[in-house]
Regions:
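Long, structured stretches of catalytic cores involved in phosphate-ester chemistry, encompassing
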Residues: 1-133
């Protein structure tokens, strides 16, 4: 089964959370994933959401483009991916919803570069999975 699968099962099954959210960072690229009950079956239930933020000064775009971009069509649970821009994840959390803005800089080499919202998502209470807004 593997450690990660076992950990996910324990975390999600034992806690009975209606829409768990994982937020993590600095993979040198930005992601939004649906967490699936069983990844080999793309039609399995969505049980949560993961938001991954990059570092504001990340600069490994070419590597991640080669490593990941070609596999996105095989991973329909990926809702957003950006390997080119450094940035951060901005969250606004209430009891009703979790709103996320994927904030990314136009340039990591220019300290005066604009930071803009590349994508926005919402996770509603009791409804697992992120919806793009």
């Amino acid at each position: 089964m593997g450690f990660v699968a076992l950990l996910c099962g324990v975390t999600l099954d034992d806690r009975r959370t209606s829409n768990p959210i994982v937020i993590t960072g600095d993979m040198h690229c930005s992601w939004v994933f649906d967490l699936k009950a069983y990844y080999p079956d793309e039609d399995s239930d969505t049980v949560g959401t993961e938001f991954v933020g990059t570092s504001i000064a990340s600069g490994l775009g070419d590597y991640y483009e080669e490593a990941y971009r070609g596999h996105l069509d095989q991973n329909p649970h990926v809702r957003f991916f950006d390997e080119r821009n450094g940035g951060y994840v901005r969250c606004d959390v209430t009891q009703e919803e979790w709103r996320v803005e994927m904030k990314l800089a136009d340039s990591i080499s220019d300290p005066d570069s604009s930071v803009r919202t590349f994508a926005s998502f919402v996770v509603e209470d009791g409804k697992p999975g992120a919806e793009r807004t």
